[in-house]
A protein has these predicted regions:
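Feature for soluble, non-membrane regions of globular proteins
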Residues: 1-201
Length: 201
């Protein structure tokens, strides 16, 4: 099946004031759509065209060399953004609960310590990329990736990811990436992140 743009699970303005409606419109309708269009071109005519996105990214080094970079950037971009929309909510913020909260406390000390590590990784990411909370098969970890690289490419499971490409925040925050990262936690859906954790723990 070709890659397809998933609908936003909320209105463009639902995440204001943290993320403004125009940023959401451009980010979803233009940027994400471009990753899909270019990802489909990269996979077209290969044995990977009908494979699940997760399988493509987990085996990115097996793709034809002349398609690999485009697939890495664009299929990765699609996977990253599809998750990004799902883990945000107009009713977001607060703190996690249950097994996820326990795992965060065991690994990082507290939710505030986790936020600090995720934010620091995002601030330190030079240029464009993502900052992540992942499950690496044994437990939780914070990592960052360049461009549209996905933790799926290294066998890890993304639980939470924050886009630190400028297109994700520049209209509202200009060059103030730390402010964007600090504000983003107001829209995180811990319910969605917790469901992702339950699926892999």
């Amino acid at each position: 099946m070709p890659l397809e743009l998933p609908p936003l699970p909320y209105d463009y303005a639902a995440l204001e004031p943290t993320i403004d409606a125009e940023t959401m419109r451009l980010h979803h309708d233009k940027h994400h759509q471009a990753y899909i269009d270019n990802g489909n071109k990269a996979l077209e005519g290969t044995e990977w065209a009908d494979r699940p996105v997760e399988a493509v990214l987990a085996n990115i080094d097996l793709l034809p060399e002349d398609r690999r970079a485009a697939a890495r950037n664009n299929v990765g971009g699609h996977a990253n953004h599809a998750m990004f929309w799902e883990i945000m909510s107009a009713d977001g913020g607060g703190e996690p609960s249950g097994a996820l909260a326990d795992a965060i406390a065991d690994t990082f000390g507290s939710i505030d310590d986790l936020k600090t590590q995720v934010n620091e990784a995002g601030v330190k990411r030079f240029g464009s990329g993502w900052t992540w909370l992942i499950h690496d098969g044994t437990g939780l970890a914070v990592v960052s990736t360049p461009n549209q690289d996905s933790p799926l490419m290294t066998g890890d499971t993304p639980l939470l990811g924050i886009d630190v490409w400028e297109h994700a925040y520049y209209l509202n925050y200009q060059n103030r990436r730390p402010d964007y990262l600090a504000a983003w936690w107001n829209v995180v859906s811990w319910e969605a992140v917790g469901a992702r954790f339950e699926a892999v723990r």
